[in-house]
Amino acid sequence: MKLNITIGIPTHKRPKLLKRAVNSLIYDENINVKIIISVDGIDNTFEEYKLIEKSVFNKKNISFIYHETKIGSLKNFLYLRDICDTEYFMWLADDDESSLELVCELQKLLDNNLNAVTAVPYWELKNEKNEYKIIQSSHFNDQLKIKRVFKYIYDSDDVFFYGLHRAEKLKKCSFNNYWWPNKDALSNWCYVFQMDLILQGQIILLDNTNLRWINHDYGIKYYPRSSGEKMMKNFSYIMRRINIYYLYILKFLKWKKYIYIIIFILPFIFLLARDIIFKEPVNKRIKF
C-alpha cells in the first residue's frame, strides 16, 4: 500500500525523549511517509538534536527544522500541520511512541471510510513506574453531526488529536487563545480545536488493541499552564471553562450551524455547572 502521510513531531528541550519517539518509527524506507521534526528554538540542547539528526541522516524521509528563536508550543504544532503537503497528517509528541504498522492501519481505515475525517487507535497510558493501562479512545462515528457534538461535549478525551487526520480537514481547524487570565495558557486547547473536526466528519476507532499509541504521562512539560496560586488557579479554571463553551458557540457560527446555538445553550449551562462542581474531566480520571 502506498502511504501518503506526514508525521509531525514538535519538540523543545527534550532531545533524549525525541530519540525514543523517532526510534519507534524506524521502518523500511520503501514506505512512503514523511517525518518532520520541528525544534522550537536553538538553545543548549541544540547539539543533542544535531546528534539525533546525524544518526538518521541515511533516512531520506526524516527531516529536521530548527527555529532560530522559540515560537511556542501551539505555533510549533500548527507550523507542522501547515507545511504538510500529503493527504494525511498526524502529530506525535516528542515523549510518546507510535509505529508504522499502526499508521498503515489507520490509513486503510480512512481509505475505507470516506465520511471519516480522523482515525484514532487505542491508547496506552504509562506512568513513571512503567505501569500502564490500555484505554479505548473516545470516538464519534455517528452519521448525525448533532449526535457527535452532544457526545463530544458531554464526555470526551482529546486523544484523537494524535490520530491520523485528513490534512485538508485538519487545516480548517483553529484555536487562537483564551481570555484573561488564561491568555497564555494552553490547557484544554485541543478540545476547542477538535470541535472543528467533529463538525466536519466522523472520528472512527481502529478496533485493534495490539496497535496502540503510547502516551508517557510524566516528565517536564514546556508549555504555559494556568496560574499556580490556589485562589487564582480556581478563578482561572472557571474562566477557562466558560471560555471553552463560548468558543464552541463560535465554532457553530463558523460552520453556519446557527440552530446548534439554540439547541446547546441549556446543555452548555448544565455542563459548565458540572465542570465547576466536579472539575474536569468527570469520567476520565485514570487510576493505575
What are the residue ranges of the model-derived segments?
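Short, well-formed alpha-helical segments that are part of the catalytic scaffolds
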Residues: 14-27
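Acidic donor-binding segment of Leloir-type glycosyltransferases
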Residues: 25-65
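Glycine-rich, basic loop-to-helix element that forms the pyrophosphate-binding segment
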Residues: 67-84
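Short aromatic/hydrophobic "clamp" motif used to bind/position activated sugar donors
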Residues: 89
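Conserved donor NDP-sugar-binding/catalytic core segment of glycosyltransferases
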Residues: 101-134
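Catalytic beta-strand/loop signature of glycosyltransferases that borders the donor
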Residues: 122, 204-211
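Short, flexible, basic/aromatic active-site loop/helix in glycosyltransferases
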Residues: 136-156
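A short, conserved alpha-helix in the catalytic core of glycosyltransferases
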Residues: 169-173, 181-207
